[in-house]
Amino acid sequence: MKAQKGFTLIELMIVVAIIGILAAIAIPQYQNYVARSEGASALATINPLKTTVEESLSRGIAGSKILIGTTASTADTTYVGIDEKANKLGTVAVTIKDTGDGTVKFTFATGQSSPKNAGKEITLNRTAEGVWTCTSTQEEMFIPKGCNKP
């Protein structure tokens, strides 16, 4: 009698079924992980801008003269040091009023970020008194630490 070599069709089908079950669990978890990491990346992109805004306001530069871009700052205008598209996941916008209140906002781009984040925003809000808060329109499970649902 010959010794058996290889696997039977049933054994191979069982292995394929097990791999399919594992993939059905792992893929959604990975997509959630990606969405959470994108939120952290967006917040890390805009968080340093708080320092630039505060420094500009303390030098007496009015909020409307705090602009997005990497151009060299002048005596009466501050460029925040990053481009609007500094992070490939979306765009950055800075809107500070002359009174000192305003926002630094990151908007996730459709097609560049995960579908779970597309079109969502992370916003750093500044009050005229200089208090910063963070809000996000992302689903609760994807909001980075330190931010809240509006």
UniProtKB/Swiss-Prot annotation:
Q: Tell me the disulfide pairings in this chain.
A: 134-147
What membrane topology was assigned to this protein in its record?
A: Single-pass membrane protein
Q: Which InterPro entries match?
A: N_methyl_site (IPR012902), Pilin (IPR001082), Pilin-like (IPR045584), T4P/T2SS_Core (IPR050470)
Any matching Pfam family: Pilin
Q: What PROSITE patterns does the database record attribute to this sequence?
A: PROKAR_NTER_METHYL
Task: Give the highest taxon in the source lineage.
Answer: Bacteria
Gene3D superfamilies in alphabetical order: Glycoprotein, Type 4 Pilin
Keyword annotations for this protein, in alphabetical order, are: Disulfide bond, Fimbrium, Membrane, Methylation, Transmembrane, Transmembrane helix
Name it. Fimbrial protein
Give the encoding gene's name.
pilA
